[in-house]
């Protein structure tokens, strides 16, 4: 489907966790707990949104879709990572490596696009409240969600097809704990590598920066409108609807900038592994915590839903 270039390399060896030989069991237990918490946290958000009629609004529809993208992103990466921590054979087949890159980039960029859509939703709600029902109609929301998923899939296809059209020769050890673009490019050879490497980086950075700048622009208008509210209580109430989203944006793009905008130069295997862990494990882990703690309406609804499921006879 992606026109992959099957070279003499039939598999790769993931060596990222070899930098921490004495910590692998502890890391396995830690990442397993974080993985389960991420899944359960996002599932609880989804169940709460769908079971509480008061949350059937565009903002919570987007949040529910964001939870789906986070679940799929973690499922695409972490189970394989957990298996490698318990194994001495950390080989990954050529096609499995391509699939991991495709799904991780697809769901990762879908997450970024959905955060952008949520920023636009907050902009419309605060700056154009009288037109909110028109601009954020069910059809319009479905279109925004569909475009986010389609955009993520296109990004995944572009990156995967560009990388796996290259020829891989020499060493087949990936200096990472998952199939990741920069260490894969170091294994590629051929005349087209100098063009593909900056091209892929430019596409990814442009997409991320475009989303980030759109969110910044949305919040610039939001802050300007909030400052016009005369009462402090009104300003706090308006800003509270944005606090959880803004916090997740800072976490998401903060960790993403570490991965994609780090300066060129010699990098240690330990440093690359730790930076990768922050983005692939820690970011999805923090997201449901932030939304459940900083969104008062969602927090109350989650408590109600949890109580109903645990003690149905008392409801």
Role assignments for model-derived ranges:
Residues 1-315:
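Transmembrane helical core of 7TM receptor-like proteins
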